[in-house]
Amino acid sequence: MARLLPLVATHPEPPINAPLHTPNAAEAHAVVRDGRPLRVALLGYRSAPFSGGQGVYLRYLSQALMQLGHDVTVISGPPYPHLVEGVKLVQLPSLDLYSRDLWSVTREELGDSLGRKEWFSKLSGGFAEPETFGERVRDWLLDHADEFDVVHDNQTLAEGILDLQRAGLPVVTTIHHPITRDLRVALAGEPRWWWRLMIRRWHRFLGMQSRVAAQLRHIVTVSRCSAADIATDFGVRPGPLHVVRNGVGTA
């Protein structure tokens, strides 16, 4: 785990209104271990390049890590991110039911247990992608565990991610904010009881995310406010939480 920590919390958190910190050459060198760059796996259960934010985040984070000299691989479910040259992409296909008709799924696709889970979840108004991606990426990484020094999960928060930690892989997770906050906003704006039921159904993955987050050893978030929300809503103790502010490009 010694290799992981410099990427998570190299500096104490600055005051709220402090300028963002830019690593200098010495600090960039400090995250290199054993005379070689780190081999970083960045995980995203869906990484659309132009909407939702996850694909944008993975593009810029992977680019910055590569510019620091690290060997970066993004492992993603569909839709896949647009990455800069030099960053590798491992595609883990799913049914991707938000880009196709539910009834276009073939019998062969439903022969897979994870495919069935995605299909029946979508049929009943749920969202199973974080859970199913967690299982797929767990199986893939356990087969390639010796190829990476750090596994950085982008808010999948699935049981499969916890399995990787239990297996001894160095795992860090970014939680931008707990989606429990989105759920509250959605419920507050919907007076119709049947739609409120559907909103709660879609957000059922939050039970899994809360259980997983409370057991993770290393969590990155982007602000003190998000850290407080994560502690309150997900029951995360202060120890695993590290605030690392989002970078801002000034060029």
What are these regions (language model features)?
Residues A2-L20, N24-L38, A64, V74-L141:
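A conserved catalytic-core segment of Leloir-type glycosyltransferases
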Residues L102-G125, Q165-G207:
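Acceptor-binding helix/loop patch of EC 2.4 sugar-transfer enzymes
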Residues H144, R211-V212:
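Structural alpha-helical scaffold elements that stabilize or flank donor/cofactor-binding regions
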Residues R39, D71, P170, R217-H218, ...:
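Residues at the starts of beta-strands that form the adenosine-phosphate
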Residues G125-L142, V150-R184:
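An aromatic- and histidine-rich active-site surface loop
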Residues C225, G247:
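Carbohydrate-associated surface elements
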Residues H152, M198, Q215-R224:
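A short beta-strand/loop micro-motif in the catalytic core of glycosyltransferases
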Residues Q54-L65:
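Short amphipathic alpha-helix
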